[in-house]
A protein has these predicted regions:
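A short, internal acetyl-CoA/4′-phosphopantetheine-binding micro-motif in the GNAT/acyltransferase core
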Residues: 44, 68-75, 203-217, 238
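Conserved acetyl-CoA pyrophosphate-binding loop and the N-cap/start of the following alpha-helix
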Residues: 74, 78-86, 215-223
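Amide-forming acyltransferase catalytic core, primarily the GNAT-like/NAT-type
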Residues: 13, 117-202
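Conserved beta-strand-loop-alpha-helix junction that forms the acyl-donor binding cleft
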Residues: 71, 101-110, 129-133, 235-245
Length: 282
């Protein structure tokens, strides 16, 4: 069975999250309660013992499955499939028809599971750690752009331009600790697809980090740096674009994680309503 997480479940998150090997730190209880716990479901067996957890972000017909973790002694017993089936049932109940997640390509068992439930690989994403002095070496383009904070009126255009699920930006805006930035060409202010990032100064990192061209990364990074904490000599970001990944590798960016982004329809009976088709990217 699945149940919503409670403050007491931080111990399960803290025990299981490192097994995902993302390289990210375990959040302390207060930050976990503010950021991850609201979307976390705890999986229990028939005796009330915790066997794993899932962290979900549900957005207007789309679900981003952020974490899936199973207790080590319960792996290889079909528990992962049971957890995903239970998640799918919950999503169907709220008319959520699409889901996506990230998985390491070397985790062959997980990749097989996700393919078995209808997901396919859409692209590869690479998480980087980049010292700010290295970021200054990224090649710049000739296009004149400025950075600005994202206004709610800009959300739909940015989401459409970067094939993001509707509501993702509004969901990020609910967290006052996040900084939402976009790039604007003064000569073409209606062009919403130049650059967009959500920056977490406490992490510190940017995800999503989207640019129309790798040469637009420098001005977006410069805007992010204006919001960094004084004790932060580096930035972490996720590239979902081959040209940007190549540019970051060329200047010596450190790869922290490479993953497949997989997505598909939530399996099971058709929902009572039929939301519009969702973009491939979450």
């Amino acid at each position: 069975m699945l149940r919503p997480a409670t403050p007491a479940d931080h111990v399960h998150y803290a025990r299981l999250f490192p097994d995902l090997a993302t390289g990210d730190p375990v959040l302390p209880p207060d930050r976990w309660l503010d950021t991850i716990a609201p979307g976390t479901l705890i999986a229990e067996d028939g005796h009330g013992s915790v066997i794993g957890y899932a962290y979900l972000q549900i957005l207007q017909g789309n679900c981003y499955v952020r974490h899936v973790a199973i207790e080590p002694d319960r792996r290889g017993q079909g528990r992962g499939r049971m957890l995903m089936d239970a998640i799918a049932a919950r999503l169907r109940a709220v008319d959520c028809t699409r889901w996506c997640l990230n998985v390491k390509p070397e985790n062959e068992a997980a990749v097989r599971l996700y393919r078995a439930i209808g997901m396919t690989t859409r692209h590869t994403m690479t998480a980087f750690r980049l010292d700010w002095d290295l970021a200054a070496r990224l090649p710049r383009g000739d296009r004149s752009v400025i950075a600005s904070l994202v206004a709610p009126a800009d959300d739909a255009a940015i989401e459409a331009a970067f094939a993001m699920p509707a509501g993702q930006i509004a969901e990020a805006r609910k967290r006052p600790d996040l900084v939402l930035l976009r790039l604007v060409d003064p000569a073409r202010p209606d062009d919403a697809g130049l650059g967009f990032a959500v920056y977490d100064p406490l992490f510190p990192g940017a995800f999503p980090f989207r640019v129309a061209a790798a040469t637009l990364a420098p001005p977006l990074l410069a805007a992010i740096r204006a919001h960094e904490r004084p004790d932060t000599p580096y930035i972490q970001l996720v590239s979902e674009d081959a040209d940007l990944t190549a540019a970051l590798l060329a200047i010596g960016g450190t790869v922290r994680l490479s993953a497949l982004h997989m997505a598909g329809d939530v399996p099971g009976p058709a929902p009572s309503r039929h939301p519009p088709s969702a973009p491939d990217r979450c």
